């Protein structure tokens, strides 16, 4: 889908190249610079959910980097098998979070279409409400999966911080903070959608899981950060 918006950059060669590139590629194929350029535009995708997923992918990649700097070092021979397994898990989490960048954009499309449906007659109003409810559910599922995946990543980055190379421990701390931010950011995308849901029981269920993930993993990420700080200061 080509995103149509006006940012004052229409005559800019870089902007035109990005828009042409967008017709046949994924957001995760963009350069960092191009992704930020598109993110700063008026189009709703990529948005906060995709940005959160990307932040999470960067966060766990930092943990994976710590693992890469640990494997093969005699000092860490005793934990090498554990670190290798952690790196495999980190690769999987990274791939899933990058996929969620795309899925978040895809989930917004039916919601956007639902907002644009006519509501001139009782039948149209009823149909719009039905389609809107289904779209809101879909728009909650992706950020909830981002949260779940970031929670896995926080558990994993704790191991990188504890067992990984001490010269790179600060990178594990940075990764933990990014994953916490990604978790929190994804939760906001749940809350804004559940607020509009007619099925209050379903909305409460989504909110409950988001609240529980935040309660456990915001604290855990903070603990990792604080332990890293205590070791390097």
Task: State each model region's role.
Residues 74-113, 213:
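A structural-propensity feature for long, helix-poor, extended segments
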Residues 3-18:
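Short, Lys/Arg-enriched N-terminal segments with co-localized hydrophobic residues
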Residues 65-77:
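Transmembrane signal-anchor/signal-peptide helices with a preference for the extracytoplasmic
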Residues 104, 108-177, 181, 193:
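Amphipathic alpha-helical interface segments
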Residues 21-30, 145, 192-193:
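Polytopic transmembrane helical bundles with strong interfacial aromatic enrichment
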Residues 153-156, 168-227:
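Preference for long, well-ordered alpha-helical segments
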Residues 27-46:
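Short, hydrophobic/aliphatic alpha-helical segments
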Residues 41-64, 167-186:
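Conserved phosphate/anionic-ligand binding catalytic regions in large, soluble enzymes, centered on
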């Amino acid at each position: 889908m080509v995103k149509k918006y006006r940012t004052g950059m229409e005559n800019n060669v870089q902007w035109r190249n990005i828009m042409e590139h967008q017709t046949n590629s994924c957001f995760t194929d963009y350069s960092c610079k191009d992704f930020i350029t598109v993110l700063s535009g008026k189009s709703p995708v990529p948005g906060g959910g995709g940005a959160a997923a990307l932040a999470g992918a960067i966060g766990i990649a930092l943990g994976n980097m710590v693992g890469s700097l640990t494997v093969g070092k005699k000092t860490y021979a005793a934990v090498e098998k554990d670190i290798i397994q952690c790196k495999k898990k980190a690769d999987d989490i990274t791939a899933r979070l990058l996929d969620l960048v795309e899925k978040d954009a895809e989930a917004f499309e039916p919601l956007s279409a639902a907002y644009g449906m006519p509501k001139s007659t009782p039948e149209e109003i009823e149909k719009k409400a039905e389609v809107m409810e289904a779209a809101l559910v879909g728009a909650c599922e992706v950020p909830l999966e981002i949260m779940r995946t970031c929670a896995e990543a926080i558990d994993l980055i704790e191991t990188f911080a504890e067992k990984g190379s001490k010269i790179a421990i600060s990178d594990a701390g940075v990764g933990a903070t990014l994953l916490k931010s990604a978790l929190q950011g994804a939760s906001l995308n749940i809350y804004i959608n559940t607020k509009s849901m007619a099925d209050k029981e379903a909305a409460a269920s989504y909110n409950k899981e988001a609240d529980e993930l935040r309660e456990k993993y915001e604290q855990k990420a903070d603990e990792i950060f604080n332990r890293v700080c205590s070791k390097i200061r």
